[in-house]
From Swiss-Prot:
Residues 1-27 form the signal peptide. The keyword Metal-binding does not apply. The lineage of its organism: Eukaryota, Metazoa, Chordata, Craniata, Vertebrata. This is Apolipoprotein C-IV. It holds the Pfam family APOC4. The gene is APOC4. It comes from the Eukaryota. One of its GO terms (cellular component) is high-density lipoprotein particle. It is found in: Secreted.
Amino acid sequence: MSLLRHSLQALPLLCLCVLVLACIGACQSEAYEGTPSPPPEQKKSHWNLVQSRMKEFLEPAVTRTRDRWQWLWSLSALRGFMQTYYDDHLRDLGPRTKTWLLESKDSLLNKTYSLCPRLLCADKK
């Protein structure tokens, strides 16, 4: 019972980590969209390794799911609904998430600086 309670408590943190990794991957892919190959510093990055491992893990599942649900997607009414939903809610999800992450970071830094003693952080305000 205790193990189940701890795993349920860890679930939101795991979801947050997956969301952050997905956002980082989306931001990196948008930044290097026009370049033929990533720069050398990205090739050596640990984040690039995490991104490639996640892609290895998720790509087959996404492909299998897409193949299994292809019959449903072929229905024109559902396709129209899904396209409208995507256009209304999901098209700009990457930039919105990136903006939210930057605002959250700025807010956290401001709160941290407000708690910092003036002697140490006076020049950073």
